Every structure is written in C-alpha cells, then in structure tokens.
Amino acid sequence: MKTVAVFLLFLAGTWAHMCMISPPQRGSMMGINKAGADDCALVTGPCGGRMAMPHTGIALMAGENFTVTIQKNLDHYMASSPGMFTINMREGEQGEFKQLAMIKDMGEPSLSLYSTNITVPHPMGHGMATLQTVYVTKNPQAPAMFYECADVHIMPRP
C-alpha cells in the first residue's frame, strides 16, 4: 500500500502544468505543444525558481489594456474543488504581488489557451515590474500552485 501511495504522489507532481505565452515567460518554452512540458511544471514560488531577466522584458504602457495569454499545459481539474489561474503584478523584484485578474478552471483539456485583458498599473518607482501567473490547483493530490513570471517595463503615459 505504501508503494502505491508513493507512486500516486509522484504522479501528482507531474500533472497540472501551466506556461505563460504572452508576455513570454522567463526561460524557455521548450516542448509546450506537448502535454507535460518541463518548462510548464514550475512549483517554486514566486517565479518558478527562475531568475529575473530585466533587459529582455517587453514594454507596456501604464493605463493601457494588455492581453495576457497562458496555456494549461496539462489538465488537473477536480470538479469538487475547481482551481483557478491568477494574473498578478509587482514593481521590481521584491514586495507583494497585486492580483489583476482571475480565470476559473472549468475543466478545459490539456493545451487549452486562456486569454484575459488587464489594465497595466501606473508605476510608483523605476518602471520595472514582474508579471506573474499562478495556477492554483485546489487539488490535494497535486502541487498546490504552479508559477510563471515575465519581466516587463512599464512606461508612463505621455
């Protein structure tokens, strides 16, 4: 029985992947057209264990709408406790994230894309920010959350 429990725990860690398509996530997106891609299985908060890449981020205009697109790379929906995807932002590399949007997991299949518009917040400081997406599984047989981040530069409105 212990062997079965350990095997199920191992399997749970391989389910429920998420990748951020737009803006491009930190690191690579190797193999994302196949369910279960390693680049979509990052469980270390707040950014999947990937370091900032501030000189590679895209520029966003404060106060404008921007479409964030994520991929549910591998489904882990549980009808009795459905999860969600959150889109969050913080200035720079430190501090608290502020939730900008939430998408409910309705049991769409692996490789499904989700897009939502956010209003880019006005920067308080130097304009560099971290955009974070989190897949909150709410499934006790899986990791609680999967993380991706993108580095962005927020430009003030003229």
Spans of model-derived segments:
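Cleavable N-terminal signal peptides of Sec/SRP-targeted secreted and luminal proteins
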Residues: K2-A16
